[in-house]
């Protein structure tokens, strides 16, 4: 139905009819009214109002399973109907709407609506031109009443009007005598004249402080004036001296800061008035002060006393500063120069002259914009921008405090500049440039000040330049220069891919041991204590953990995915991620599992197709292959086999490997250097995956590519000069082939059915037929490299290529020998051929001998200072400290022989293990003079290098070489009928190495215990008269023992016969934990399916303690302490006897192995033999062994080193152990002489008096059973009697024990002699320096001795002369007292002498 529109002439009746027809028709209106939104203005006309839908729950649509226990998503505000959701909005429009930059303001220019502006026509005037507009005239015009101005603006305007108002004619009285150009002064009015004090120059026109602004009444001004007049009246009634006194009293009561503020306020006001007066007469020049003085005197009358008092007081309170002179005279007409604020213009002055430091006081360090440390007296020009700071403005450079303050600036450029300077400072500190020029550590100071979290907060900035600066500073802090280069260059070494985690090794109660097979649930599940610790506490112990707790990884993901920064920022972020992945397995898992982080990196920086990149820096790294991204994947894969499997499967890394390896570096359409590094990292990533037995299918696909790459190696090696990047690529390719060859070996059988040892072995996709043709291609490479052995410069340029060739051949022969279906004669003949063609000519070359000679120069053990930590090393931030690279003569230097010799020894051991007939020919290596000299220096008594991150890394590679030499020596010993001359040296080296091996080398320690340490062939003394020599030595020093079975020679012979039992005992108590042993065994044997990670355990300490020969005895002691009922006698006697036998062998023939154990620690371990059981010491074998070991401790050359006062390893307190020993002796000894000898040994005079006080004070009952004869005392008697005792408390205990009869010569001859000697020396001492208390005690004790009823004891105490153990009494006596002693006795009181009745 069409309704016609109203036509002209129709009335309202027609309109009402049309409306009723429309309503009856029910048609939709042509226009719809919509209520506009208050927040967004008018709504869209085409948008329908939202309909009210109800939520209806349908049972059929409900799921069958209960919902997962996942946290509900965070609630968000529901948008209004007229406001689209953020995800429906164009991102560009959203960014434009939220953009607050100044450019956004300038780009949105809206023309102002002038339709409502009133247009005022010009006023008709008879002047041809309008008057010139002056700004001063505008100020004098009163504002319209209708205009609204703020109170503050009105006050400022009124103040300006009052200041600019010129004085009236009657107020200005020019001086008749004033010269031309003099400044007229103001004459006070009649009202002000009444407020002027007589005889004073100051008039009080109005109150200075009380203004009445806070009063709301209309009479506020009158009230203020009344108060002012009262104050003036009181001041007029006071003398100047009283005013000054009251002023001083008031100033003493007020706050100095308030006084300073009031003075500054008054000074500013007076200065403003003076300048306003001068500005009213701009045509007159200013007059010097000297010419103004008489004029002012004429104007004001007489000089004011109060001015002099004021000036005197001002000089006392604050020094006067020179007035600031402006370079021009300010004009009143200038904009904003009506009031000159001089305090704000001080910065325009020239800098004061630099003050030279005359003392040695410490000064605040200042740095340049490049992070250089500036000298305190350096004078630099100001245009360099190094003087824009407040404190010490004359000194150039910025302090750390000022840079921290600048990072909080509102100007983004200043924040970025401060972060850049801080990053330069951190980088130079990491590089060791500051050295000893600074007190303390810069990095420690920065971290304590919160630098880490300052960088984290800066990452959340909205400005790209600030983010870039923060990322660069974070990289400078976390990534030490040289660390990554060192680890990359040694990747192809012998087990070079296995590294220690770069996490702090210090103990922390919140740190938990990480399991090798760390699952995702365990990584995500934190302990309540660690989860509740704030990031600053975590960062104090571990910087990386503290950073990860601040959601650093999601922020990195946002920066990479959303902001798309430049190449430098991308490389910095990747470097930081690599450092985080090296921290631990937990950190690597967190990097891997950060949402969309790895996906973004793989998608953006490892694409499979890209546009060709020209020479020069790339504008962007996005959609371009990046070698750093590939390295990140490799480091993540090194953390665990699960991570490597996920990278290969979930992130499509297989296709990336195929893409980057299939083409040669020169064909990758990338810069040559970047292409070389990218291919190298691809080889390394594949090698890491192959270390777990993964990636075998890629080998079949890329087999032609690898063969072609191998064939090109010899020609590349013959070109000169050799490129370091190419050498690293070749070595990485050979390392990859080594791991692939090991993957083709037969899977070993599980050693047991336990869970930790039984790993489900997936059959390898690589078989022997796939790798059998690799050796003919690698041997030409080795032959080509060995040609350069006589040219050191070319040999050093080869890098790890020769080592990688040797390691590949060792893996090849090992895998070949494990093929059960092949004829052994084939590989045995090939080994003989290889020996004749390669090894024997190599071993006879002089350059190889020079390599053995250079071992000492490059050894960390022989040069402990080379492993010393840097001054900037932090325990919470692990770094290898390789700033500036390694020196050539170091373990990782370019001239280091360690990588090649270690690989050569590994190959020789493999050949000797497979072909026993080659051992004698290969043993020629052991006779190298340089190797023997190196071993002699390694076993020499010297302090071990401090265990730092770099020393742990370097020592691990050095221990590999030492172990391989010992393994070869063990193989050679089995094939030689007579022991070699260096056998004893090799045995000492094995003993020393066993106590030095670090975590991760559990398999090596176990092999040493099995093969070298307890091997009878490594003890040539047993067959060459060693026992007889021991008996002869003991006979010369101690006298011949009656029982031949008690002699040391017989005990040594018995110990050599019991070596298998001794080895079983130590294997049971000193072997590493089974789980760690199996992990290490899989790594060193090449059992790839059982390798769980290439991250080694944290090197907190060596695997075995330095006193490992006593470890079974210590375990037995702890078991006995925890078992009150006692241990089985058979186990106790057997373990104790084996330990004592082995310790006796080491004491006699291998004292170098016990140099690290001090004699006091050995004595404490012997005392544990008696504390284990109450009957153990009665066993005859135990007594003989303990007596022999005690005799070794009491030798004249060992006894001076027996120090019981210093801290002992493994012992908290020797006095506590000795107290327990006395209790045990008193309870179970029954006067055993050997037991008593151990009790007496710590009572020597040079040891602590605490031990003697414990015996004579708390364990006097021990004296009754301590019946060791003087002839059996293992040390000279003079060790107990000399020097004289100086402890008064102990002397009194001696005397009390003698007088009471607790100490007698019949049951305790040794201590009886000691007590008599010290008491006699004390009572007859006439030292004038003694205190009054000592003199009184001495006189009292002498009187008591004189009055003793026991004539024998009195005779001994008075006539004692010298100790003599050959006499029955143990000492000599004076037949008659010397004259001096007789005279001293005459000083006693007469009654004492008469009562004594003793004749001298």
Swiss-Prot record:
Q: Where in the sequence is Phosphothreonine found?
A: 329
Q: What keywords appear on the UniProt entry?
A: DNA-binding, DNA-directed RNA polymerase, Nucleotidyltransferase, Nucleus, Phosphoprotein, Transcription, Transferase
Q: Give the region (Disordered) as residue ranges.
A: 35-54, 60-95, 161-215, 269-310, 504-539
Q: Which InterPro entries match?
A: ARM-type_fold, RNA_pol_II_AP1_C, RNA_pol_II_AP1_N, RPAP1/Rba50
Q: Where is the composition biased (Basic and acidic residues)?
A: 39-54, 85-95, 269-282, 519-539
What top-level branch of life does the organism fall under?
Answer: Eukaryota
Gene Ontology cellular component annotations, sorted alphabetically: DNA-directed RNA polymerase complex; nucleus
Q: Does the keyword DNA-binding apply?
A: yes
**Any one GO molecular-function label of the UniProt entry:** DNA binding
Name the Gene Ontology biological process terms.
transcription by RNA polymerase II
Which residue ranges have biased composition labelled Acidic residues? 509-518
Location in the cell reads:
Nucleus
Give the quaternary structure: Part of an RNA polymerase II complex that contains POLR2A, POLR2B, POLR2C, POLR2D, POLR2E, POLR2F, POLR2G, POLR2H, POLR2I, POLR2J, POLR2K, POLR2L, RPAP1, FCP1 plus the general transcription factors TFIIB and TFIIF.
Family under the similarity heading: Belongs to the RPAP1 family.
> What function does the entry list?
Forms an interface between the RNA polymerase II enzyme and chaperone/scaffolding protein, suggesting that it is required to connect RNA polymerase II to regulators of protein complex formation. Required for interaction of the RNA polymerase II complex with acetylated histone H3.
Name this protein carries in UniProt = RNA polymerase II-associated protein 1
Gene name for this UniProt entry: Rpap1
């Amino acid at each position: 139905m069409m309704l016609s529109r109203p036509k002209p002439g129709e009335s309202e009746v027609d309109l009402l009819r049309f409306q009723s027809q429309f309503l009856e028709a029910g048609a939709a209106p042509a226009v719809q009214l919509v209520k506009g939104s208050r927040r967004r203005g008018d709504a869209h006309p085409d948008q329908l109002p939202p309909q009210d839908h109800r939520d209806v729950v349908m049972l059929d649509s409900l799921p069958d399973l209960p919902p997962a226990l996942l946290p509900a998503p965070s609630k968000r505000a529901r948008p209004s109907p007229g406001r689209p959701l953020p995800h429906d909005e164009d991102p560009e429009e959203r960014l434009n709407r939220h953009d607050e930059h100044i450019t956004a303001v300038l780009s949105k220019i809206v023309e102002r609506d002038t339709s409502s502006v009133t247009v005022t026509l010009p006023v008709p005037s008879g002047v041809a031109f309008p008057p010139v507009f002056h700004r001063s005239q505008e100020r004098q015009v009163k504002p319209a009443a209708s205009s609204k101005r703020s109170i503050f603006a009105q006050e400022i305007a009124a103040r300006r009007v009052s200041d600019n108002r010129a004085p009236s004619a009657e107020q200005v009285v020019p001086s008749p005598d004033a010269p031309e150009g003099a400044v007229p002064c103001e004459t006070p009015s009649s009202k002000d004249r009444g407020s002027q004090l007589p005889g004073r120059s100051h008039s009080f026109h109005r109150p200075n402080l009380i203004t009445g602004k806070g009063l709301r009444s209309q009479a506020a001004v009158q009230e203020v004036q009344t108060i002012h007049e009262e104050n003036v009246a009181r001041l007029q009634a006071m003398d100047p001296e009283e005013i000054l006194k009251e002023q001083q009293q008031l100033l003493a009561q007020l706050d100095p800061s308030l006084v300073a503020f009031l003075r500054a306020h008054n000074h500013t006001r007076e200065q403003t008035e003076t300048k306003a007066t001068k500005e009213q007469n701009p045509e007159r020049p200013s007059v010097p002060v000297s010419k103004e003085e008489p004029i002012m005197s004429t104007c004001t009358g007489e000089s004011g006393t109060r001015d002099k008092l004021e000036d005197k007081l001002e000089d006392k309170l604050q020094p006067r500063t020179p007035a600031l002179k402006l370079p021009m005279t300010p004009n009143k007409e200038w904009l904003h120069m009506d009031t000159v604020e001089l305090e704000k213009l001080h910065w325009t002055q020239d800098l004061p002259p630099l003050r030279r430091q005359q003392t040695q006081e410490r000064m605040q360090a200042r740095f340049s914009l490049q992070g250089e440390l500036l000298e305190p007296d350096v004078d630099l020009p100001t245009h360099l921008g190094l003087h824009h700071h407040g404190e010490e403005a004359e000194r150039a450079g910025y302090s750390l405090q000022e840079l921290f303050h600048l990072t909080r600036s509102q100007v983004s450029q200043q924040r970025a500049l401060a972060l850049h300077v801080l990053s330069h400072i951190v980088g130079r500190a990491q590089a060791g440039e500051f050295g000893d020029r600074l007190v303390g550590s810069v990095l420690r100071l920065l971290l304590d000040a919160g630098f880490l979290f300052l960088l984290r907060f800066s990452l959340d900035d909205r400005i790209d330049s600030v983010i870039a600066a923060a990322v660069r500073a974070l990289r400078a802090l976390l990534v030490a220069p040289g660390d990554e280069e060192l680890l990359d260059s040694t990747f192809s070494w012998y087990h070079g891919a296995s590294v220690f985690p770069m996490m702090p090794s210090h103990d922390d109660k919140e740190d938990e041991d990480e399991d090798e097979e760390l699952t995702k649930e365990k990584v995500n599940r934190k302990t309540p204590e660690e989860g509740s610790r704030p990031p600053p506490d975590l960062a104090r112990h571990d910087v990386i953990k503290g950073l990860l707790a601040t959601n650093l990884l999601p922020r990195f993901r946002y920066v990479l995915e959303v902001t798309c920064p430049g190449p430098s920022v991308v490389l910095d972020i990747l470097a930081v991620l690599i450092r985080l992945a090296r921290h631990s397995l937990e950190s690597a898992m967190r990097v891997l599992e950060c949402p969309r982080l790895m996906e973004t990196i793989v998608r953006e920086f490892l694409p499979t197709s890209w546009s060709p990149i020209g020479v020069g820096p790339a504008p962007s790294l996005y959609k371009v292959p990046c070698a750093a991204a590939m390295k990140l994947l490799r480091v993540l894969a090194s953390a665990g086999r699960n991570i490597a499997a996920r990278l290969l499967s979930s992130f499509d890394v297989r296709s990336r490997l195929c893409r980057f390896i299939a083409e040669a570096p020169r064909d990758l359409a990338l810069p040559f250097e970047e292409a070389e590094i990218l291919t190298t990292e691809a080889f390394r990533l594949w090698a890491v995956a192959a270390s777990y037995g993964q990636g075998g299918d890629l080998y079949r696909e890329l087999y032609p590519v690898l063969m072609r790459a191998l064939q090109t190696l010899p020609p590349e090696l013959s070109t000169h000069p050799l490129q370091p990047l190419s050498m690293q690529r070749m070595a990485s390719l050979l390392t990859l082939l080594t791991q692939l060859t090991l993957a083709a070996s037969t899977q070993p059988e599980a050693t047991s059915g336990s869970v930790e040892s039984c790993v489900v072995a997936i059959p390898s996709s690589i078989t022997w037929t796939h790798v059998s043709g690799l050796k003919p291609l690698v041997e030409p490479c080795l032959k080509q490299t060995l040609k350069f052995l006589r040219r050191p410069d070319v040999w050093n340029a080869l890098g790890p290529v020769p080592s990688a060739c040797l390691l590949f051949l060792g893996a090849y022969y090992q895998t070949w020998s494990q093929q059960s279906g092949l004829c052994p004669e084939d590989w045995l003949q090939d080994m003989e051929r290889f020996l004749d063609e390669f090894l024997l000519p190599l071993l006879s070359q002089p350059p190889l001998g020079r390599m053995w000679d250079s071992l000492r120069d490059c050894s960390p053990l022989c040069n402990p200072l080379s492993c010393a930590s840097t001054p900037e090393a932090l325990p919470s931030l692990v770094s290898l400290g390789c700033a500036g690279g390694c020196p050539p003569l170091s373990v990782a230097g370019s001239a280091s022989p360690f990588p090649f010799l270690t690989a050569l020894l590994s190959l020789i051991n493999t050949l000797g293990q497979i072909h026993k007939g080659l051992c004698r020919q290969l043993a020629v290596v052991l006779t190298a003079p340089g190797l023997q000299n190196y071993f002699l220096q390694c076993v020499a008594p010297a302090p071990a290098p401090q265990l730092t991150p770099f020393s742990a890394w370097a020592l691990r590679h050095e221990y590999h070489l030492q172990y391989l030499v010992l393994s070869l020596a063990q193989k050679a010993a089995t094939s030689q009928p007579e022991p070699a001359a260096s056998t004893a040296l090799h045995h000492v080296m094995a003993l020393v190495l066993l106590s030095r091996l670090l975590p991760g080398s559990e398999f090596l320690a176990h092999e040493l215990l099995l093969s070298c340490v307890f091997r009878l062939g490594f003890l040539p003394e047993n067959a060459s008269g060693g026992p007889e020599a021991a008996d002869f030595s003991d006979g010369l020093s101690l006298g011949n023992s009656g029982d031949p079975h008690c002699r040391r020679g017989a005990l040594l012979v018995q110990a050599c016969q019991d070596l298998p039992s001794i080895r079983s005992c130590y294997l049971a108590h000193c072997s590493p934990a089974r789980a760690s042993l199996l992990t290490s065994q899989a790594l060193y044997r090449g059992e790839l399916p059982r390798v769980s990670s290439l991250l080694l355990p944290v090197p907190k300490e060596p695997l075995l303690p330095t006193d490992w020969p006593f470890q079974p005895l210590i375990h037995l002691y702890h078991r006995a302490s925890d078992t009150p009922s006692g241990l089985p006698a058979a186990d106790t006697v057997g373990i104790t006897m084996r330990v004592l036998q082995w310790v006796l062998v080491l004491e006699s023939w291998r004292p170098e192995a016990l140099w690290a154990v001090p004699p006091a620690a050995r004595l404490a371990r012997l005392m544990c033999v008696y504390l284990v059981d109450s009957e153990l010491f009665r066993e005859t074998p135990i007594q003989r062994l303990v007596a022999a070991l005690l005799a070794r401790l009491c030798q004249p050359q060992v006894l001076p080193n027996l120090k019981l006062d210093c801290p002992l390893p493994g012992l908290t307190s020797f006095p506590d152990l000795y107290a327990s020993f006395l209790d045990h002796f008193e309870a179970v000894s029954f006067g055993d002489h050997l037991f008593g000898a151990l009790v007496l040994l710590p009572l020597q005079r040079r040891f602590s008096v605490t031990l003697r006080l414990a015996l004579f004070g708390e364990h006097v009952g021990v004296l009754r059973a301590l019946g060791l004869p003087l002839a059996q005392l293992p040390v000279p008697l003079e060790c107990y009697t000399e020097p004289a005792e100086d402890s008064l408390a102990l002397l009194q205990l001696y005397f009390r024990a003698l007088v009471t009869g607790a100490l007698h010569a019949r049951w305790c001859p040794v201590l009886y002699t000691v007590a008599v000697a010290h008491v006699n020396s004390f009572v007859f001492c006439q030292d004038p320096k003694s205190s009054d208390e000592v003199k009184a005690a001495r006189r009292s004790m002498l009187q008591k001795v004189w009055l003793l009823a026991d004539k024998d004891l009195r005779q001994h105490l008075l006539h004692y002369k010298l100790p003599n153990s050959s006499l029955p009494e143990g000492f000599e006596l004076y037949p008659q007292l010397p004259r001096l002693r007789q005279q001293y006795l005459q000083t006693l009181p007469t009654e004492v002498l008469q009562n004594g009745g003793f004749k001298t």
